[in-house]
Every structure is written in structure tokens, then in C-alpha cells.
């Protein structure tokens, strides 16, 4: 309703140049960096028709809701990956694919079911053990009273209604006596649980605090 919105206008290659080291460690192998650059470029091109920020003349934001964009110092390794793949995107049947990616899997990759969408033919589940990652498993304690809502009333419980083969939550319900809120979209589930969450203990024992959403819906 009030305030200032800053909009940063950059060309796609400059955008990818800063997204790449923001989304993947610059120490990763060259081929991994190249693959990530192609994914990042494909993703941003596919968002060009996104109207979420049309009011501001923008297509995307700089968070995990789209892709993390930290306009900090670029790295030589990621710069080389961007240059080596300049202009390259992934398409299927003449159309850009929706190029989702993640930092850590729960033991296997997922299909589009986690976004309540049908799965294209080019996506297949594969084993992807990632148990050496700090984010492979995590724990957190939530205060149920934090979910009391003026519209719904006093929160009486949170239940997981459906999970995928890999363990991702596909449906989550917050109960309020005779009322309930049901969340089925991956980001909505992460935000619903993460909104009042103060501390997360990761797989390696390290602690993350004041996160805007939980690390995953798994």
C-alpha cells in the first residue's frame, strides 16, 4: 500500500551470471556449473510472461520463489560456465521446459506431483542419495498456539495427509476445531510451516534461525 519498490533491469546473461554463484557453490565441477547455468537461463526465459509483478514492470523477484539473485562479486568458474553455455536453454517439443532444480534430495528426485501438476514425459524419478548434505534431514519444534488464526480460530492440530514415495509432504492440514486449512502446493506447505518457525537443526547438527520457510517439504 505504501513504500518504494526497487526494480533491477538486467539482460538475461548478466542475470544468469549472478544467479549461478547464488544457487550453486562456485567450487563445483565445471560441467555441473554449466548444467546449472542452462537451467537458470531456461527458467528465467520461461518466466518472461509471468504477471505476478506486472504492476512493477518486473517478471520475477530475487528469492527462492524464483531464483536467488545476489548481485555480489561473480566468480571466475561460474563466469566461464555462463560464457560456455551462452544462449543455451532446454526445450521439449519446441517449448521451453519448466526447469526446476534443488540443492538436496530426500533420496530420489520427484515428479511434478509435488506442485500438484501433471508430469511431462521428459521427467523421470531417479535414485539420488544425498545423505551427506546438511539439509538431507532436519528437525524443528513448533508451538501450535502460534497458528491460532482470527478467521479460523484456535489451532488444534497439524496433520500430514499425503506423502510422496521420497517422503515429501503433498498435503498438509492445519485443524481449527470445525474448520481447517489444507495446503497442497510445495511452497505453500513450506511457508505454512516456516512462518512461525524460529529454529531448524540440520542433519550435521548445525542450526539455522529465522528462515522465511522450511528447507524442504520432506
Please annotate each region the language model reported.
Residues 1-218:
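Conserved, single-site charged/polar hotspot
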Amino acid at each position: 500500500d505504501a513504500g518504494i519498490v526497487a526494480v533491477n533491469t538486467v539482460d538475461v546473461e548478466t542475470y544468469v551470471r549472478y544467479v549461478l554463484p547464488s544457487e550453486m557453490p562456485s567450487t563445483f565441477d565445471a560441467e555441473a556449473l554449466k548444467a546449472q547455468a542452462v537451467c537458470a537461463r531456461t527458467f528465467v526465459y520461461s518466466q518472461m510472461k509471468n504477471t505476478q509483478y506486472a504492476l512493477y514492470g518486473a517478471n520475477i523477484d530475487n528469492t527462492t520463489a524464483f531464483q536467488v539473485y545476489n548481485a555480489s562479486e561473480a566468480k571466475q568458474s561460474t563466469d566461464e560456465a555462463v560464457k560456455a553455455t551462452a544462449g543455451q536453454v532446454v526445450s521439449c517439443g519446441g517449448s521451453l521446459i519448466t526447469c526446476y532444480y534443488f540443492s538436496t534430495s530426500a533420496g530420489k528426485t520427484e515428479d511434478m506431483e509435488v506442485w500438484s501438476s501433471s508430469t511431462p514425459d521428459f521427467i523421470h524419478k531417479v535414485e539420488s542419495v544425498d545423505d551427506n548434505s546438511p539439509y538431507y534431514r532436519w528437525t524443528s519444534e513448533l508451538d501450535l498456539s502460534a497458528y491460532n488464526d482470527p478467521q479460523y480460530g484456535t489451532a488444534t492440530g497439524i496433520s500430514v495427509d499425503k506423502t510422496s514415495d521420497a517422503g515429501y509432504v503433498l498435503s498438509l492440514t492445519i485443524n481449527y476445531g470445525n474448520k481447517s486449512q489444507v495446503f497442497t502446493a510445495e511452497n505453500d506447505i513450506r511457508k505454512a510451516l516456516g512462518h512461525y518457525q524460529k529454529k531448524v537443526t540440520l542433519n550435521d547438527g548445525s542450526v539455522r534461525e529465522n528462515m522465511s520457510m522450511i528447507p524442504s517439504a520432506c
